[in-house]
Every structure is written in C-alpha cells, then in structure tokens.
Amino acid sequence: MVSDARIDDVRTFWDSRPCNIRHSKAEIGTLRYFEEVTERRYFVEPHIVSFCNFPEWHGKNVLEIGCGIGTDAEQFARFGAHYTGIELSNNSLQIAIDRFKVSGLKGEFVQLDAETCDSYSFNKKFDLIYSFGVIHHTLSIERALQSIWNIASSGTRVKIMVYAKNSYKQAMINEGLDQPEAQFGCPIANSYSADEALDLFTKQGFSNVKITQDHIFQYKIPEYKEYKYVKEPHFEAMPNQVFAALKKNFGWHLLIDAVKI
C-alpha cells in the first residue's frame, strides 16, 4: 500500500487495468470474450460460485459493491436476480454495461465509491449486498462497511471477500516471492486476519458473522499468461486433500457471510 495514496489513485489503477480484463484473447466487448472471461474466472476461482450461490437470489434484489467488468453480475442476472452494481472505475463500469447489452440482460449500474455509496438513493431494499475483493482497496474499510450497513435493511444478507493476512500469498509477498495477481501494484491493498475481520463486522453491527478461507493460486505465471494451466511443481506434487487443507487454513480470500438483523 502506498502511504499517501488517494481513492483517485485506485480509480486510475483500475481504469488502466480492469480486473480480469486479460482473461480472454478475444476482442473485448464480444460475446465470445465475456464467455471466455467467465470460464477462466471460475476455473481459477471455483469457490466464488459456491460462495455466491447464484440460484439462491432468483427474484431477489442484489447490490454488488465493485462490479468490475461484470462477471459475477452476469451470473446473478442470468439466475434471475434483480441486479444493481456500483463501480469506482469508469472503464470497468462501461465494460460491465456493454456486457449486459451483448448478453441481453437487465441490470442497473452506477458509478460510485464504496465509502460514500450510502449517499445514493437506490429506492429499493436489497436482499443481498455482495462485494468480492473490493473494500480492501478503500482508504477506510470501516467507512465502507458503514455505507453497506446504511444501505442494508433488516434481514439483508452480506457476502464480502477481503484478502487474508494469515495466508500463503501474504507470506510470499512478505518474503518478496509474490506471484502477481490482479491486485499487484494497486495503490491500496490491505489484508486482514479472521479475528480482525470479525471485529470489523461485529463492531459495525452485523450478526451471524461466519468466516471461511479459500483460494491459493497454483499455476505458473508465464504459462498462465498464455492461457495454459501448468501447476507449480510443489502444487503438482501435493495431494488434493493436502491442498484443500492448505486453502482452508492459508487461502488468500477471507469469505465473510453476515446479516443485518
């Protein structure tokens, strides 16, 4: 994290390289492009599908904080959710809007900052507020959570992912052995322990807070950039059961599920 970073710096960063923008070689904005982005995202991060449980939100109002280029947004809409997405990056937001047009889906998109989005009048109650890998890029996660709390109604479910401090990935970063992923170079990128995350959510007032951990990127970067999935030798040699245990205890993603009572 850059010590004097501003939210405008974060916006500029994601405008220059929207998250997952290189997940396909196809022409950006085409149906094939979006299909390949979706396939790659959920192949590398399959836990997103189970965490979101898209079919559960059929007919429900869903708000996504930080929709990016709209991959998860598309799935919510395809499974029948009444979808609203906000996004800091204008370039990312426009791709998400184009994605819905190309795919023939309905949704509402607004350019907003996670820390101040509660100033916007959504004129609806949300059954789910979802955010995956976003609010750890804010100047104040406390302010972002307060905004989410203010938007939420009694009974609103909240599902949020933030980076995990006690993780394999963070250990590699600390030792200068980091394998770059989407966040590499972002001016603001914080990580949290499960206890810190629990404290943040409970202090804000959320109830029934459940936290799990998942995701270790296991592929060689040069090959991955060429859309080939070749595991690092130590992961290739690791039994599936051991790798599952490693993800559960040292995964890069803290998956937080809570509710506003």
Tell me the role of every PLM-derived stretch.
Residues 30-60:
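Conserved alpha-helix/loop element of class I SAM-dependent methyltransferases that forms part
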Residues 1-35:
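N-terminal, positively charged/glycine-rich alpha-helical extensions of SAM-dependent methyltransferases
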Residues 142-157:
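A short glycine-rich, Lys/Arg-flanked "PGG" loop and its adjoining helix->strand segment in the class I
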Residues 172-182, 195-199, 209-261:
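A C-terminal cap/extension of S-adenosyl-L-methionine-dependent methyltransferases
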Residues 130:
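A conserved beta-strand element that flanks and buttresses the S-adenosyl-L-methionine
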Residues 188-205:
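Short alpha-helix
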Residues 60-117:
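Class I SAM-dependent methyltransferase SAM/SAH-binding core
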